[in-house]
């Protein structure tokens, strides 16, 4: 079977790796990712425009497509491929609004009484926004309605001093159309521990994957600006050290009810659904959805997949998804990023990766926003590569992953604290304090 994987990052490298033993991989990339290039052979094309992607897929006789990035979903690539007779693992443009339109997502929860929602309002009038914020007695979270690459959300107490500073930023979101829409979502700030559950969906049923915790802050100790994700970890039981089985099942139930609601609103949601939750004292609260695999979270779960990825993809597009099994291993993923990331990452700097030594350690290399020219690899201004270590427990995986970073040379940095006992135990104590 011929499968086209759209996307250029470490997430797509992981998707290609999961499919490579069962299918012939074709690739559409924005830059020459060395890991994807290796798996796709000569069957790749460097482009982004939807009509050219569809033409390329048709000319190559592709049987199925797997869409990685959200921008292609918002652009309607799945719809265009389906019109050409090519089914896709990825929702239609309308169904993808669960990610691309935050007001749509919150209204869906309201209309269908899906549990796990939080207090919110959507504004497009700066004066109405000002009146609301003057009386809003919770700490505010400001979210552009549209896509911002994971970097548009600002939270009082983290990035903003108080609700008046939140008002200033929210007004800017409206006036400058940050996220592509002249509107903004204001939500109450929920205190707890964030976690992610990803699920395969055939439009009727979802098959959940192990829970993961991402680390979006740029610097150690959860400090600094929000990034696309500096790394993540998962545990051997599919839960997290602070997450109970009931918490996990409640999150999965929220996701299943969401897929049911989307089906009634837009038609079947076929693809990957990513739920970002805040585990509060009252249980899981839905923070946001992504309409595709998380990056880095995809790299925690895909190396553990025991089931056939090809059969899962076929089940998604055919509407008869069955099940998926995962190895009982923990994982730690650490991103190596250019100096200055995320504000002004060093671009064009050469990096050297001793993949053989990393592989011999049992650690996996996934290339991200780098560009290969001949036998040399150069950074862009974004994340360069991810290292993923599977092991029997989180702390063993962390030690292995950290040791492997020594085999990557260049003007890069990473968060050394992800997956460490100190940071994980801090999460556990935080939840214990909240629940008591």
UniProtKB/Swiss-Prot annotation:
Keyword list, A-Z: ATP-binding, Ligase, Magnesium, Manganese, Metal-binding, Nucleotide-binding, Purine biosynthesis
Residues that hold Mg(2+) 2 according to the record: 288, 290
Cofactor(s) required for function per UniProt: Mg(2+); Mn(2+)
Record-listed Mn(2+) 1 binding positions: 276, 288
Catalytic activity annotation: 5-phospho-beta-D-ribosylamine + glycine + ATP = N(1)-(5-phospho-beta-D-ribosyl)glycinamide + ADP + phosphate + H(+)
GO molecular function: ATP binding; metal ion binding; phosphoribosylamine-glycine ligase activity
Binding residues annotated for Mg(2+) 1, in chain numbering: 276, 288
Residue ranges of coiled coil: none
Gene3D superfamilies (alphabetical): 3.40.50.20, ATP-grasp fold, A domain (3.30.1490.20), ATP-grasp fold, B domain (3.30.470.20), Phosphoribosylglycinamide synthetase, C-terminal domain (3.90.600.10)
Pathway(s) the chain acts in: Purine metabolism; IMP biosynthesis via de novo pathway; N(1)-(5-phospho-D-ribosyl)glycinamide from 5-phospho-alpha-D-ribose 1-diphosphate: step 2/2
Keyword Membrane: no
Residues binding Mn(2+) 2: 288, 290
Class of enzymatic activity (EC top level): ligase
Similarity comment: Belongs to the GARS family.
Protein's UniProt name: Phosphoribosylamine--glycine ligase
